[in-house]
Amino acid sequence: MSQLKIGSSQCLWTSICIVLFVLSMARGAVSRNYGDALTKSLLYFEAQRSGKLPSNQRVTWRGDSALRDGSDAHVDLTGGYYDAGDNMKFGFPLAFFTTMLAWSNIEMATQLKAHQEQENALAALKWATDFLIKAHPEPNVLYGQVGDGNSDHECWMRPEDMTTPRPSFRIDAQHPGSDLAGETAAAMAAASIAFAPSDEAYAQILIGHAKELFEFAKAYPGIYQNSITNAGGFYASSGYEDELLWAAAWLHRATNDQIYLDYLTQASGTGGPRTAFSWDDKFVGAQVLVAKLALEGKVESNGKIAEYKSMAEQFICNCAQKGSNNVKKTPGGLLYFLPWNNLQYTTAATFVLSAYSKYLTDAKASIQCPNGALQASDLLDLARSQVDYILGSNPQNMSYMVGVGTNYPKKPHHRAASIVSITKDKTPVTCSEGFDAWFNNPAPNPNVLMGAVVGGPNDNDVYGDERTDYQHAEPAPATAAPFVGVLAAVA
């Protein structure tokens, strides 16, 4: 009897050891998957490049394109990134994802370096900032769009074949756009911090542009789509107060100049409680940056500063399901904000969680939510759960990042990826031929858009993988940029 007990005990312990070993191996596999996803997330930006591609271009199915952008205005507007799955360059979302790429480079510099991706991450950022510098040729002039959104969307063409009009649109003193100028100022200021350790001269150039753009945004108030009306149907801004706070917060972090902190504390409001962080709504970002100052003890956490911090933490509490207005979750556990490209909001919110986890750790602080406390580790655990969902731990067992695992979207809504590469067939694909032969083709895309994150599933965790479903199948840099930082944080 005792021998039986001993044998059973040994069997039990053997079973436990096997289970623990399997779990540890699975955990290691996930960890390695984060690193793989991080590498691929940066490859995606190379697939989005416009202009003359560099000799070290790794996404070789793409070719040079849009080499005359800006010629109608006698300005060089080549380079930069295409928007989502089309061939447009929309300055407003472009500037936002540039800011988020910069923030990823800043907060997760150590992790990016450890995974040997810092050089690639900075290269992705510089491809954007080089373009933004060219788009700002005078203190009160900023080019905010290249291409006509309507004609572009009426065609399905490779960027290398484009025959659609490429008009250049700008804002200036007579045609203002405080939101566009403010967001671009934020991008330049944030990028200056990212580049300062390796290229101080370039960082100073960026700071100069950021300061000019911030003054331009303040001096000539206005919503940019009233000046660039073509943008209104695609990326309409809901206001410019958030961009001005966001820009001031980044300029203060980059320069430590009191005037930018004064702007933040003397503003009429802090944005109040927000339900999302996105290319249109930067209040959460500004709130988080000011909260960081308070956590570091660089400013007194009272008055307006305390309000910024409270609003930032209220957003985090709601994401963590411990607030008074919690973010909806799908049955599978995904933070769900809006039906159209929900993952852009999820990755942005998850970046906030990752960054704030770092701030709390450094400050040895926690958050007191209406329904319980949150430690730094809780925030990172929630961020990791969202990453895991996006990379395949979901009811469909599908990775929503292209190229990760074997079950991932094969037909993302993306012109360049869905048409045979120009390196394989140089025969031009016309506007209508693209729709007939490629857009409506039920086959998978001929080019794998490695690292792209699609719009994601609906609120019931269902994803159909149809090229025609642009609300769920279209990837965008605004989704990918914050995800770079999140992946680095959890890798």
From Swiss-Prot:
It is an enzyme of class 3 (hydrolase). Its EC number is 3.2.1.4. The active site is at residues 86, 413, 465, 474. Keywords: Carbohydrate metabolism, Cell wall biogenesis/degradation, Cellulose degradation, Glycoprotein, Glycosidase, Hydrolase, Polysaccharide degradation, Secreted, Signal. The keyword Glycoprotein applies. Pfam families: Glyco_hydro_9. InterPro entries: 6-hairpin_glycosidase_sf (IPR008928), 6hp_glycosidase-like_sf (IPR012341), Glyco_hydro_9 (IPR001701), Glyco_hydro_9_His_AS (IPR018221). It catalyses: Endohydrolysis of (1->4)-beta-D-glucosidic linkages in cellulose, lichenin and cereal beta-D-glucans. GO terms for cellular component: extracellular region. One of its GO terms (molecular function) is cellulase activity. Residues 1-31 form the signal peptide. It is found in: Secreted. Glycans are attached at residue 397. Transmembrane segments: none annotated. PROSITE patterns: GH9_1, GH9_2. GO terms for biological process: cell wall organization; cellulose catabolic process. It comes from the Eukaryota. Belongs to the glycosyl hydrolase 9 (cellulase E) family. This is Endoglucanase 14. It comes from Arabidopsis thaliana.
